């Protein structure tokens, strides 16, 4: 309740909803009403890039502000578990996002009223996928916000992370698939992961152990069976791509794998 109240007392909530709905309204008018096309799912697919811009703004202060003001120490000693506190913050952001989604649910009905033939099953399946995609982006933004005390850093890193996530399917197509290239990229990625854990735990011993054991395992596996690395990172990144899983929802397919993934 506190987090949700702060969104509307600081105008962030109103600005988010206004910008979110105005952009969707413009796309709906241009594509569905003016164009006379009933594929509302394609409209949602076209504006999913909004998450890259809007979600970092919503989540940048959600945990970073607590870290900056040192009020996170009070949260640790509260009678409520940390899990419940984080879930409370998460559901506060999701509730704000959900208000916008509820408004969007009216769009297919309005389009039908104005003579645009909308396939409601596809439209509402896409809305479900759009909502789940948004909640996944919110979770990423919250995690990044928890790693820093600076709202600006949280916002910028969230923006870059979400942008890369949305571009993963394009990026993987440009990566070399040879075993040695994939192995080197995995080794570098592991070092980045170790640095993230170090930032969270601030423990040099854990950092060194993770880095040494991980790097040793990566190169030993390559020496034993290098063929395992052929296209390995490419396949992993394709699996992690958020936006590609939205495609099934656009086709009216409620893919349980995608639902669980989000």
Language-model-detected regions and their locations in the chain:
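Hydrophobic alpha-helical transmembrane segments
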Residues: 1-66, 90, 106, 198-201, ...
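Short amphipathic alpha-helical coupling elements at transmembrane boundaries
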Residues: 2-6, 73-77, 235-238
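Helix-loop interface residues and adjacent transmembrane-helix termini in multi-pass membrane transporters
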Residues: 8, 79, 147-148, 253
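Select subsegments of transmembrane alpha-helices in polytopic membrane proteins
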Residues: 12-17, 92-99, 182
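Alpha-helical transmembrane segments and their helix-entry boundary regions
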Residues: 13-14, 85, 153-155, 259
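Secretory targeting signals
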Residues: 24-29, 35-41, 50, 92-158, ...
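Terminal transmembrane helical anchor/hairpin motif
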Residues: 31-38, 154-262
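Helix-loop-helix units of permease transmembrane domains in multi-pass membrane transporters
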Residues: 62-92
């Amino acid at each position: 309740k506190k987090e949700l109240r702060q969104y509307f007392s600081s105008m962030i909530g109103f600005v988010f909803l206004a910008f979110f709905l105005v952009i969707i309204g413009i796309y709906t008018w241009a594509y569905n009403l003016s164009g006379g096309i009933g594929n509302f799912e394609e409209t949602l697919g076209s504006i999913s890039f909004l998450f890259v811009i809007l979600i970092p703004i919503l989540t940048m202060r959600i945990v970073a502000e607590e870290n900056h003001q040192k009020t996170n120490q009070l949260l640790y000693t509260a009678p409520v578990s940390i899990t419940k506190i984080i879930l409370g913050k998460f559901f506060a952001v999701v509730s704000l996002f959900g208000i916008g989604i509820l408004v969007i649910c009216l769009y297919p009905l309005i389009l039908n009223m104005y003579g645009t033939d909308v396939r409601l099953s596809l439209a509402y399946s896409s809305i479900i996928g759009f909502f789940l995609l948004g909640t996944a982006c919110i979770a990423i933004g919250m995690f990044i916000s928890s790693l820093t005390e600076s709202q600006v850093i949280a916002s910028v890193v969230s923006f870059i992370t979400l942008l890369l996530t949305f571009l993963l399917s394009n990026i993987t197509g440009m990566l070399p698939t040879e075993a040695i290239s994939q192995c080197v990229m995995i080794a570098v990625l592991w070092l980045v992961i170790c640095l993230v854990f170090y930032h969270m735990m601030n423990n040099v011993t854990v950092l060194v152990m993770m880095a040494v054991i991980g790097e040793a395992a990566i190169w030993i596996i390559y020496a034993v069976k290098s063929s395992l690395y052929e296209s390995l990172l490419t396949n992993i990144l394709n699996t992690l791509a958020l936006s590609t899983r939205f495609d099934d929802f656009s086709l009216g397919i409620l893919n349980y794998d995608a639902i669980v993934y989000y």
